[in-house]
């Protein structure tokens, strides 16, 4: 086993890094911390949550075997507001419900088509 600090980032091929920044900022409150000509990196709500939006329009949205990635809510009652925020920001809610009583979830897609699970544990 190798010792690591954990998963450090996820890089997504996107059509428009600026549009991805706007979506993830509106929905998840990410903050930009690095930018170059074709990439924007953002810090998520967790101390080590990093997403990189890399301009690669030819393969944008092609998850290559990755089914989804997730964000965990701090309160279960926020699931409805989360779904509404996704739709206002240009995303799509694909399904929602409860894994168990009081354990809500929603699967959504960002503007490039990546599936995101929003849930409470």
Range-by-range predicted roles:
Residues 1, 57-60:
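Short, flexible, solvent-exposed loop/turn segments with mixed acidic/basic and small polar residues
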Residues 1-3, 7-15, 60-121:
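Vicinal oxygen chelate
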Residues 5, 11-54:
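Core segments of cupin and vicinal oxygen chelate
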Residues 40, 49, 67, 102-106:
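Short beta-strand micro-motifs in enzyme catalytic cores
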Residues 49-51, 59-62:
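Conserved segment of winged-helix/HTH DNA-binding domains
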Residues 54-58, 120-121:
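Acetyl-CoA-dependent GNAT
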């Amino acid at each position: 086993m190798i010792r690591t600090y954990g998963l450090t980032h996820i890089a997504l091929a996107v059509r428009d890094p600026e549009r991805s920044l706007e979506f993830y900022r509106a929905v998840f409150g990410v903050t930009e911390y690095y930018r170059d000509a074709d990439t924007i990196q953002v810090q998520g709500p967790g101390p080590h949550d990093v997403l990189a939006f890399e301009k690669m329009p030819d393969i944008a949205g092609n998850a290559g075997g990755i089914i989804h990635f997730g964000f965990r809510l701090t309160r279960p009652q926020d699931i409805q507001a989360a779904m509404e925020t996704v739709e206002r920001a240009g995303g799509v809610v694909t399904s929602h419900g409860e894994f168990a009583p009081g354990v809500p979830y929603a699967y959504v897609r960002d503007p490039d088509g990546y599936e995101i699970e929003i849930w409470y544990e």
